[in-house]
């Protein structure tokens, strides 16, 4: 914003005193010249002119530090170009007048005062837009039979559109569960609403437009190498395991029915009435066979088996 350069500027009287002293000394020490035609009666006029000029110079020097019309600083990587205000298809703000600003994600677009340093200026807004788009493509399915797997539920909705993700959730105290299903487009989600009331398993499901998007899987849980990716193809995720079933009993069951087990990790806590397990087989064919074991009763509860999204990562306790 352009402002009058002299508005609000104060010059200390001590500076004026210094100016007077310096100017007087300059006049007094001026060497005499034989060609000097200036009448001595005009010496006071000359002194006043020098004082005025010196004051103006110092005043302009003071104001230049605060002048919004001062010359714009140009980084060295921009100064090498012919036009410092335009570089790499980007326009930048200068102090002369505002120009169109085009900030590209991840490139010279960090927030001011280093808040959120290293992140794009528009990342938050972009994430909100992407999240809203995901919500429009997602449906919420309730009253799902607890024997139904994610794969079976996703297969039911394939006629509505391409399924991107299916996330099954539920309380261990309830015989029914719920799920979120994401499609590639909003049209698939709208078509899925027609499935509401369909008998699936032992209970009719209900389908609504979701108010939230499916939370992404923690990247640290996903395969981190080609070897772990291959292990996922041989691994199944088993849930609803009776707490009375031991690790040895579970391993013997899968070994007898499906094939040799390479690794098995059984997990549980005091808060849940059931446990979960990750079972890695020697062969991928054994893992495929294990999917057919979903619904088999071990102890007093039917287990649920689905393909694992993560490999088995053993702890020291699992090696004992």
UniProtKB/Swiss-Prot annotation:
Keyword Lipid metabolism: no
One MF term in the entry's GO annotations: RNA binding
Domain RRM: 137-212, 234-310
Segments of this protein annotated with the region Disordered: 1-44
Record key words, sorted: Repeat, RNA-binding
One Pfam entry name: PAM2
Origin superkingdom: Eukaryota
Composition bias type Polar residues, residue spans: 12-44
Motif mapping: PAM2-like: 65-75
SUPFAM superfamilies for this protein: RNA-binding domain, RBD
Domain statement: Contains a PAM2-like motif, which seems to be involved in the binding to the PABC/CTC domain of PAB proteins.
PANTHER family: LD29830P, SERINE/ARGININE-RICH SPLICING FACTOR
The name this protein goes by in its record: Polyadenylate-binding protein-interacting protein 13
The species this protein was found in: Arabidopsis thaliana
Record lineage: Eukaryota, Viridiplantae, Streptophyta, Embryophyta, Tracheophyta
Gene: CID13
């Amino acid at each position: 914003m352009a402002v009058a350069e002299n508005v609000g500027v104060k010059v200390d009287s001590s500076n004026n005193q210094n100016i007077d002293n310096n100017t007087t000394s300059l006049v007094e020490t001026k060497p005499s010249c034989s060609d000097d035609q200036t009448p001595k009666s005009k010496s006071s006029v000359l002194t006043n002119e020098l004082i005025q000029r010196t004051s103006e110079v110092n005043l302009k020097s003071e104001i230049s530090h605060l002048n919004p019309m001062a010359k714009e600083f140009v980084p060295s990587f921009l100064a090498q170009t012919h036009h410092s205000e335009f570089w790499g298809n980007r326009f930048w703000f200068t102090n002369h007048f505002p120009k169109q600003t085009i900030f590209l994600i991840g490139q010279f677009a960090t927030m001011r005062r280093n808040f959120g340093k290293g992140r794009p200026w528009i990342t938050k807004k972009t994430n909100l837009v992407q999240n809203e788009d995901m919500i429009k493509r997602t449906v919420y399915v309730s009253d799902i039979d607890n024997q139904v797997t994610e794969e079976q539920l996703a297969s039911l909705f394939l006629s509505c559109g391409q399924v991107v993700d299916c996330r099954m959730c539920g309380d261990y105290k309830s015989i029914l569960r719920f799920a979120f299903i994401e499609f590639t487009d909003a049209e698939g989600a709208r078509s899925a609403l027609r499935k509401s009331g369909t008998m699936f398993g032992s209970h009719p499901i209900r389908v609504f437009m979701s108010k939230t998007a499916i939370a992404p899987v923690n990247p640290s849980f996903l395969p981190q190498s080609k070897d772990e990716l291959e292990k996922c193809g041989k691994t199944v995720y088993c849930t609803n395991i009776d707490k009375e079933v031991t690790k040895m009993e579970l391993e013997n069951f899968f070994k007898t029915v499906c094939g040799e087990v390479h690794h098995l990790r059984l997990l549980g806590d005091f808060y849940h009435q059931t446990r979960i397990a990750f079972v890695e087989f020697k062969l991928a064919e054994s893992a495929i066979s294990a999917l057919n074991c979903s619904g088999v009763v071990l102890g007093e509860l039917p287990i649920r088996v689905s393909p694992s999204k993560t490999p088995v990562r053993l702890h020291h306790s699992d090696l004992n």
